[in-house]
Design a protein with these regions (language model features):
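ATP-dependent adenylation/nucleotidyltransferase module used to activate substrates
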Residues: 1-147
Length: 148
């Protein structure tokens, strides 16, 4: 099967513009993780909204490699971005919550792991609302595959 990649890109860019306009927004905020899914979405967002696209890199006990990949992508495509370190917020919240919620083992690990994307989500929505933008969400194909 032959695919016209430029036509697919143009279709997605047009769709993004339509959805943002329908919502009465001016652009998009996107979280860039250093992975393939957010990289593709970020480049599409930049094409759709060259002057109204903000990328956020939101490390929270993340690998240095993820941060490097994110910055390389964003610099390569000349996208405006901010790095918002969430480590301290995460640790503070864990300390407060676990002072009265006693858990151990796998349940504790799961709750801690789930808190990280929720902190990122809150940060993305705060930033988007402040600008009159929408959050351009990204999926993670490997998470979908395993049912996360």
């Amino acid at each position: 099967m032959t695919m016209n990649c430029e036509a697919v890109v143009q279709h997605l860019v047009t769709w993004l513009r339509e959805k943002v306009e329908e919502a009465g927004a001016r652009g998009v905020v996107i979280g860039v993780s250093g992975g393939v899914d957010s990289a593709v979405a970020a480049v599409l967002a930049q094409k759709a909204f060259p002057d109204n696209c903000m990328a956020l890199v939101l490390p929270c006990e993340s690998s240095t490699e993820d941060l490097i990949h994110s910055r390389l992508l964003l610099d390569r495509f000349n996208m405006p971005y901010r790095v918002v370190e969430l480590d301290n917020v995460y640790q503070l919240l864990i300390t407060k919550l676990e002072s009265y919620i006693k858990l151990d083992g796998s349940k504790r690990r799961l709750l801690r792991a789930n808190l990280k994307p929720r902190l990122r989500m809150t940060t993305l929505y705060y930033s988007a609302q402040a600008r009159g933008y929408l959050v351009l969400g990204t999926t993670n194909k490997s998470e979908i595959t395993v049912g996360y």
